[in-house]
Amino acid sequence: MSENDLFGAADAPESMTRPLAVRMRPRTLDEVIGQTQVLGQGSPLRRLANPASKGSLTAPSSVILFGPPGVGKTTLATIVAGQSGRVFEELSAVTSGVKDVRDVLTRAHERLVSRGQETVLFIDEVHRFSKSQQDALLPAVENRDVTFIGATTENPSFSIIKPLLSRSVVVKLESLEPDQLIELVQRALTDDRGLRGEVKATDEAIADIVRMAGGDARKSLTILEAAAGAVTGDEARKKGARRPIITPEILARRWLTSCS
């Protein structure tokens, strides 16, 4: 998938049927909530996201994003590709083998040689790759045929082979703070890509969502979306109902608490 396909899809009408967490993905590093400790000026991710980094020998050729679920690892990889103008290729370590890796690397090399177009190769759950699968990445990383970004919830010191780790910048991501999750939920309630102001939530309900999410941005939006669906269904059955409001009582429903 190219970055044009990826980010163009966010503006398509049918994208409103996608999960809220997908619709609300930041499109630039400046839209990202949290992770300020690794997104400052001059940081590896900022440098990679700069279009001027293409062809640069000083920008990192390999980055390992290490952190718990829901902190933005996939989002950051797609932003780096989109902002810098690189093609985005994605593999899952769960379903991809050595042949899949080599096929992507071959395409990336041909793209670079024939059109001068660089590629971001993103591999989710890279800690699940075997030694031979990780070994297959080394030549392309060394030759800068791709900018490799791997995501892992496991300590890279124990899950990534030493030759690849020594060529990588490790970026540690943290769970979001409560105030950051509050900002995220409030943005999703009003943003045109989110709930468009069609549903409200009390401060107490937002606090409950944040508590249930436990620092996980994706989980907070999943809970919010489920609650919005529940309260919208309730209000639709009432004649003359005003804008639906998410309350702690809605969030306490047994089926909805399973989202957390």
Question: What does each model-identified segment do?
Answer:
Residues 46, 51-53, 123, 127-166:
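Conserved catalytic/switch belt of AAA+ P-loop NTPases
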Residues 61, 114-120, 143-149, 169:
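Loop/turn-to-beta-strand initiation segments
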